[in-house]
Design a protein with these regions (language model features):
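A short, basic/aromatic helix-end/turn motif that makes direct DNA contacts
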Residues: 42-48, 157, 167
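Detector for glycine-centered tight turns/loop "hinges" at secondary-structure junctions
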Residues: 53, 68-69, 113
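Active-site proximal loops enriched in glycine and acidic residues that flank catalytic Cys/His/Asp
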Residues: 31, 37, 44-45, 59-61, ...
Length: 167
């Protein structure tokens, strides 16, 4: 299936549904920074600079799991993977609020303050998926005939709404 970015309306509906719930910060970061999920789940507050004139976050770590246990890699595969990403106003605001409440080193944490396990991530993801748009079927002209394609809206694709914020 093809990956398709969420439309503005879908993104807005999703954010409304999950505001104040655990997936909210994850989704906000995904929508406004284009970080990969492995990067979001490894993000720690020491890499989020909210007091700077232009707030930004720094990508330095990646999350993966072994036997369902989270493993945080401090060495990214390539130097190019390390980057600083400026935060739009609404995301900086969202992260400030999250940080005030947070008792963890991790921006997206489980109840114990640790990084998510694979099962916890799947649960988070399911939660998001069930509240996002339904898959759409489109007809595509391939080799002289129409074929049906199901499009599942995906987070983390380059969303058109990156430039402006939804509130």
């Amino acid at each position: 299936g093809e990956k398709q970015a969420l439309t503005d309306e879908q993104a807005e509906r999703l954010l409304d549904t999950i505001r104040g719930l655990p997936p909210y910060v994850f989704v906000m970061i995904g929508l406004y920074t284009e970080l990969r999920r492995e990067e979001i789940l490894a993000l720690q507050w020491d890499s989020v600079y909210l007091e700077d004139e232009v707030p930004y976050l720094s990508v330095r770590r990646a999350w993966h799991t072994e036997h369902n246990r989270p493993v945080i890699l401090n060495e990214l595969k390539t130097k190019a993977a390390e980057r600083n990403i400026p935060l739009p106003v609404c995301l900086a605001k969202c992260l400030r609020e999250a940080k005030e409440k947070s008792t963890s080193d991790y921006v997206v944490a489980n109840r114990d303050g640790g990084p998510l396990s694979y099962t916890q991530f799947k649960r988070l993801w399911q939660y998001i998926v069930t509240r996002t748009a339904k898959p759409r079927v489109i007809r595509k002209y391939v080799d002289g005939k129409y074929e049906k394609h199901t499009i599942y809206p995906q987070l983390g694709e380059k969303a058109r709404n990156n430039g402006h914020c939804i509130y």
